[in-house]
Amino acid sequence: MPPLSESEFLALAEAELTRIENIVETAADEADADIEVNRTGNVLTLEFDDGSKIIINSQAPMQELWVAARAGGFHFRRGDDGRWVDTRSKEELYVALSRYISQQSDVDVTLAAG
């Protein structure tokens, strides 16, 4: 997939961060997990009862979404199929986020990408 222009990437990343925000809020409610979701610009912060956080933000120069969680730091790039995948493990973004959120909330949370 050829690189996007910066404005194309920013629009795509903005839409994806909004989508993640909505999906996390819905999944947390369904799982009865206490997760505070806050968005400031291109940074989405998930805060848990124990004070830990997951931070998701867009990195326009790299055309990636970066995730910082207790499990580590991860970079996700959009593939030809439109899915965001980890640049190292190739794990899909929503599968990975489900695991990170479940680990930090001590509640089984599954994010539905669709």
Swiss-Prot record:
Keyword Lipoprotein included in the entry's annotation: no
Pfam name, any one: Frataxin_Cyay
Domain of life: Bacteria
GO BP annotations listed: iron-sulfur cluster assembly
An MF annotation (GO) of this entry: ferrous iron binding
UniProt keyword terms in alphabetical order: Iron, Metal-binding
Any one Gene Ontology cellular component term annotated for this protein: cytosol
Function: Involved in iron-sulfur (Fe-S) cluster assembly. May act as a regulator of Fe-S biogenesis.
Family stated for the protein in its record: Belongs to the frataxin family.
PANTHER family, per database record: FRATAXIN (PTHR16821), FRATAXIN, MITOCHONDRIAL (PTHR16821:SF2)
UniProt-recorded name of the protein: Iron-sulfur cluster assembly protein CyaY
